[in-house]
Amino acid sequence: MGLISKLAWRNIFRQKRRTILTVMTMTGGFVLSSLSIGWMDGSYSGMILFFTNHQTGQVQVHKDGYLDNPSIYDTIDNYNSVGEQISNQDNVRSWAPRIYVGALLASRDEGVSDGIYSNSAAAAVIGIDPVMEENATDFSEQIIEGEMLTVSEADSSLRATGQILLGKQLAVMLNASVGDSLVLFSQAADGSGADRKYAVRGIVSTGNNEVDRTTCYLTLADTQLLFALENRVHEIAVMTTSLREVDKVAAEISLATDSVGLSTASWKIFAKEFYAGMKADETQLKIMLAIIIGVAALGVLNTILMMVLERRREFGVMKAIGTKPKSIVRMIVLEANVMGLVSVLLGSVLSTIGLLILSEHGMILDPPMDYGGFVFREMVASITPACYWIPALSVMITSSVVSLIPALKAAHTDAAKSLRTV
């Protein structure tokens, strides 16, 4: 250890109160930055997973042009073959086929004569494969009353009563509950009438009020038969093994299916409004993070500047005995860096404790937060490398940069004037 390093080390412990204050300031900045990053990453990851798992999927495959202008005629033909191609791609966890059509639903209140419908509502009909949808999105967790759809003989007989799931608000509009009957009126892809009687099997709450007010669900087989879409679907929703793999998986699927006239999009594209809103909020949080780091930097600057003013006589003696200005600068910067390193180590321990608590227990939102049409009742933090390296880098750079100003001031101290300082 050189002379300058020894002097820097001794100076750190010479004024313990000042050193503790500086370390506490930098540690506080580290902890606040780390918790903010963990909270931001965890919250947004949770939002994305909730959004994609409960409704959209993380990657979607459609007929070219369908996403911009949906039509009952723009279908994915022989979808099972396309699904096999998708399954063969790396990092694909599961996929689920879907059909999207529009219809009018009508129900009658108790005591109303046959043929007279007292309640009606336009609805988006989504045809799903019960087993594949459950594997992809845990759809049954959204059913708050009744049971999940099942594949039955009724799916292949339009004369039999089918089974239907209603969105929570849609059920209220139709005054329908589990076990009640209603009628669906629409038009099939071949121009024929698509009318059928259904029994309400369950009520669905996705967390998105708009979806729950306008959507009902049929089995895929039933929807294909009713709307003359045999072996065809409008969408294949894909779930990946990790959110980090979404863009890569979308690119690989696009390469594999582009030759058959299909387009592939990640959730960032088909849910661009949700993504844009999330990025705007993320920018605000980054600004807040910069403010936290800036406040900590000002605290460190103030402390080190006071330290330099208190040690003017010491620096005057050093200049008088021939110490070079750059050596004084190096000593002060080294002192700040050592305190910064201690702050990083201490801050890492405290941040880990805080992040573990927030990731395990999270925070209950009361009242719940409405974001992008979805209602979130709980937020949790996540522990990622960014929770440590960003605050650590910020603290070390800050301690080096803000210490330069006082260090340069000390290095250019007039020895004669400083020696006359009491």
Predicted regions and their residues:
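A structural signal for hydrophobic secondary-structure junctions
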Residues: 64, 74-231
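C-terminal membrane-exit region of the final transmembrane helix in multipass inner-membrane proteins
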Residues: 383-422
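Short, membrane-interfacial amphipathic segments enriched in basic
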Residues: 1-6, 264
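Mechanotransmission and gating elements of multispan inner-membrane complexes involved in transport
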Residues: 187-285, 292
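Hydrophobic alpha-helical transmembrane segments of multi-pass inner-membrane transport and secretion
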Residues: 16-43, 279-314, 337-349, 397-401
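Short helix-loop junctions at transmembrane helix boundaries
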Residues: 345-390, 412
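Alpha-helical transmembrane segments
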Residues: 31-59, 355-361
